[in-house]
């Protein structure tokens, strides 16, 4: 999108994802983006994290802090986020709308909708279009947000106002949170290493419209292998 509109793009990518998923990085660089592994030495917030935790593999909260800091210090620079916030959740609902249409074409309707959750964009995208029918009283579908056991904001966090980033640059957001200074474990799913859940998802959990489960990493790998061997699709 930046290339299409003639914009210079800088992306702060969670370091563990930067290292483990080089093809994503290569795609962005091919289109002209500067991709920085977060935490980095290019920002005050990044340097602080690396000074305190030299081998830290990053988190969404740290990457958000670095991106906001760059935007605040660079003239004519704008910051955009790909998770957590309400407008991002709305954009992602195209996923659920397409899924709803596919189910309709197959003559089916889901009893349960499950999605992974870090900041909330994936879960929002798949669940919100179906959830509107439950809120209207037309359906009785269950919704399950699956989070890492090492980052259990919905199952063990507290619902309160908290910052969306580690350095405390963002406005306070009502969310289930483990605290914006929470240090997540170095799990493979870098995009799920986030201390809180978006405000809409958090409110839905508080109102008992969705459920949440925390799953250990090895169990997800085992389930993924089983699914691949039985269904022929690598999840």
Where does each model-flagged region fall?
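Active-site-proximal loop->helix
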Residues: 1-57, 153-163
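Gly/Ser/Thr-rich loops at beta-strand to alpha-helix junctions
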Residues: 1, 17-18, 88, 117-123, ...
